[in-house]
Amino acid sequence: MGLAVADVGWFNTENLFREANGETSAVLLLSCMDLRIAWKKGLRPWSSVCALRERESRIWEKTYVLPTGWMKTYPRIGMRPIARGIRRWWRQVGPKDSSARFERGLVISYPYYLHLHNQLRPDFTVYYNLDDYALYWPTIADEVYALERETVRVADVTVCVSKLRTDQLKAAVPEAAHKVHHLPHGTPSPFLSDRPLPLPADSPEPLSHLPRPWLGFIGSLEDRLDWPLMNRLADAHPGASFIIIGRPPAPSDEPWYGECARFLDRPNVHALGWRPQAMLGRYYQTFDINLIPYLIGHPFNEACNPTKIMDAMGATRPIVATAIPECRLHPELLHVAEDAESFLAAVKRILDQGSNDGLAIQRFELASQNTCRIVAARIFEYLEASRNVR
């Protein structure tokens, strides 16, 4: 089997399908980007990273730098270079004996990749849904939803990382409801601790000068976070160190940015900036408490499944989260807060317990049973089940 994944622009998609090579003969991870975005990143169509390369055994990568408008404005033309590249790769990794069985699989992560499916006509297609994409492109929401409904009809299996999106797509395309599955993110192998950690592990970089406890957040610093809550939390624990990992936001006139800037300016807040994916698991393990302070009611937070749930679960350390839908699914392992007072109380309670909430073993068990490799295998189980009911 050769499985092409279009695309892995988000780390969660890459982490999942990078561990799927146990189920397939080869995996091709595709990064596809607009020329303007690529230019800002220093990438050109002739850059070395745009060449097809086998980065590790049976895991191939290729980056496409495409003209502006390739996805939404003229997708039939824009997808052609990607389709040609996938066909060449299938021929390259497929058996030399043309009579041998070889399945050509395609994973698509946006509805617009339906045009890629139509050009390739693979043996099977998986629609891997990460978000409510109409929120990305609200001015063409009707077009996005129409294309998504057709994608669900055509795909052999649709996998949604959030339950809300699962329910929405089942209702929108009832004739394909049996092919739509809720499958939350898995824990990437590098994020899984070797053992349960009732107490924080050593830091991956010299931070011993910062006083404990360490309250950590890893992720984008944006409007989706409850910044007033974070400011209240910093006020409540002036002796704690708030360790923030993520690129600082660009200045903005939006009210959230003022609250964010006020938080980052505090003496007990330490914004470390961006860190490589390979290091993040160790940061989760070194925090006294991992924070998921998403703003309740924010449309993106309602529709998404934050990867940091299972990333932090793999570290086994205590997690305090606001009550967004996907966090509500783990009330026995996350300290889920319905409001600011409950969030503050949960943090205080854990710190009063010496940063050990007694749940490290249970979190370790859940993460171990839901690694990215195991979650990827479930997709192929869904695919087999779908074939059996045809």
Regions found by a protein language model. Give the residues of each.
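Conserved donor-binding/catalytic core segment of Leloir-type glycosyltransferases
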Residues: 206-225, 230-234, 242-245
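Carbohydrate-associated surface elements
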Residues: 164, 183-186, 195, 287
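Acidic donor-binding loop of glycosyltransferase active sites
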Residues: 268, 284-302, 317
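A charged, aromatic-enriched C-terminal amphipathic alpha-helix characteristic of glycosyltransferases
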Residues: 355-386
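Membrane-proximal helix-turn-helix segments that form the acceptor-binding/catalytic region
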Residues: 92-94, 101, 140-158
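A short, active-site helix/loop in glycosyltransferases that binds the activated sugar's phosphate group
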Residues: 116, 155-180
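Nucleotide-activated donor-binding/catalytic signature segment of Leloir-type glycosyltransferases, i.e.
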Residues: 246, 256-282
